[in-house]
Amino acid sequence: MVNYPHKLSSQKRQTSLSQPKNFANRGMSFEKMINATNDYYLSQGLAVIHKKPTPIQIVRVDYPQRSRAKIVEAYFRQASTTDYSGVYNGYYIDFEAKETKQKRAIPMKNFHPHQIQHMEQVLAQQGICFVLLHFSSQQETYLLPALDLIRFYHQDKGQKSMPLGYIREYGYEIKAGAFPQIPYLNVIKEHLLGGKTR
């Protein structure tokens, strides 16, 4: 398609540039990368890991016909546990994914008490639990074991954010790839299931 200069297309460009920013899908690119990675793992028979649906509170339903209900008003509830769960090589896996534009830390307000409690319960049952942290400004991704997140959460309750230095010390950097895009199973296999120690 050739774009010839004329008023209509320049007007369209101006209106699209002046639209207010919508932050509703912030982090979606990271989420899409994780979903693509999970699809790859599933297609290769390596793991079965899925994103948990966000609970919705239905407020109002219209019934235009007896057989057709139409949800008119609904709201997202706060997620009750973590983002992803599944099975890898006989092990239960449960993890949260967080993305930030900050360069030196991840805000602790992103982690809710019920999520920390859920991670503690998963670890008590010998499950593999962690958080994937993505620093979008540096394009760096880390796997931080839940135990290290929980320790930081309980010891440093006054902290507003977890420093990148702590994440680098206790976490594992994941280099992005083509297939899979975020090869976190490599870290699990090598570091969390009896491979190399820190």
Swiss-Prot record:
Residues noted as binding Mg(2+) in the record, renumbered to the chain: T81, D83, E96, Q115
Annotated catalysed reactions: Endonucleolytic cleavage at a junction such as a reciprocal single-stranded crossover between two homologous DNA duplexes (Holliday junction)
Site (Transition state stabilizer): K98
SUPFAM superfamilies: Restriction endonuclease-like
This enzyme's EC code(s): 3.1.21.10
Protein's UniProt keywords contain rRNA-binding: no
A GO molecular function held by the record: nucleic acid binding
Cofactor note: Binds 1 Mg(2+) ion per subunit.
Pfam families for the chain: RecU
EC top class, as a word: hydrolase
One GO biological process term: DNA repair
The entry's keywords: Cytoplasm, DNA damage, DNA recombination, DNA repair, Endonuclease, Hydrolase, Magnesium, Metal-binding, Nuclease
Residue segments, region Disordered: 1-22
Location of this chain's protein in the cell: Cytoplasm
Residue ranges the record marks as coiled coil: none
GO CC entries: cytoplasm
Signal peptide stretch: none
Cofactor(s) the record lists: Mg(2+)
Polar residues biased stretches: 11-22
Role description: Endonuclease that resolves Holliday junction intermediates in genetic recombination. Cleaves mobile four-strand junctions by introducing symmetrical nicks in paired strands. Promotes annealing of linear ssDNA with homologous dsDNA. Required for DNA repair, homologous recombination and chromosome segregation.
Record family assignment: Belongs to the RecU family.
Record HAMAP family: RecU (MF_00130)
Protein name (record): Holliday junction resolvase RecU
Gene transcribed to yield this protein: recU
